[in-house]
Regions:
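"…together with the soluble PPM/PP2C metallo-phosphatase catalytic core" -> "…together
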Residues: 1-217
């Protein structure tokens, strides 16, 4: 647990400093958020730094890698050892990366074409759904139970609907930050609320494995 907390702290610092450097670089290159001409009341948001999600994803990888490296073993002292990687957690990281790529393309098109509209909404939603379908199919191939748990010890069989719910969850969580981000142009605020909620859920499950041994974010 201590290793995870330390890795999370280092990941946070990495995002903090890399974002600061990135924002300075983007400003020097005049890379910022374009504004729709008809929305004059949004003029104050013009030039807001964009593509900041890149640093969040990189920071996530830093934290993930550090949390899977053991630098100290009691009785053995300093010794670098690689901890086995949970394939489900790694897949979540890959899902986040692909969603990040979709967001990067969206921001890149905005900057490239100097307009507020990057990817069309239907194209973005389609790409996100494709990623969700791939993830859902993977978990389906692992022969997980189709039982949908409302809380520990209570659930009901929903059959194939569960895999549709997984797609809905993945796309929904992605857009809960993405759409809110568009209100002020900064992802940090909305992401903090979203990540904070996921952190609390994850910590609770970690502290109560006897109740949630058969559950994970994917199972829910």
């Amino acid at each position: 647990m201590i290793a995870v907390i330390v890795a999370g702290g280092i990941s946070f610092l990495f995002v903090l400093f890399s974002t600061s450097i990135g924002v300075s670089y983007f400003k020097s290159k005049n890379i910022g958020q374009p504004i729709q001409e008809e929305l004059n009341f949004h003029d104050h948001k013009k030039g807001t730094p964009t593509m900041g999600g890149v640093f969040i994803i990189l920071g996530t990888y830093v934290g993930f890698i550090l949390s899977h490296i053991n630098f100290w073993t009691i009785g053995k002292g300093f010794k670098v050892e690689l901890i086995s990687i949970n394939t489900e957690i790694f897949l979540l990281l890959i899902i986040g990366t692909f969603m990040g790529i979709v967001g990067f393309v969206d921001d890149y098109l905005k900057v490239k074409k100097n307009r507020n509209l990057g990817l069309k909404a239907r194209n973005k939603l389609f790409l996100q759904t494709v990623v969700g379908c791939i993830a859902s199919y993977y978990f389906f191939s692992l022969d997980y139970s189709p039982t949908f748990y409302l809380f520990s010890g209570f659930g009901f069989d929903v059959g194939f609907i569960k895999w549709i719910l997984i797609i809905f969850l993945i796309v929904g969580i992605t857009n809960s930050v993405n759409l809110t981000d568009g209100l002020d142009g900064l992802v940090a605020g909305s992401a903090t609320v979203s990540f904070g909620g996921i952190l609390i859920i994850s910590f609770w499950i970690f502290r109560h494995p006897e109740y949630y041994s058969s559950l994970s974010l994917i199972h829910i």
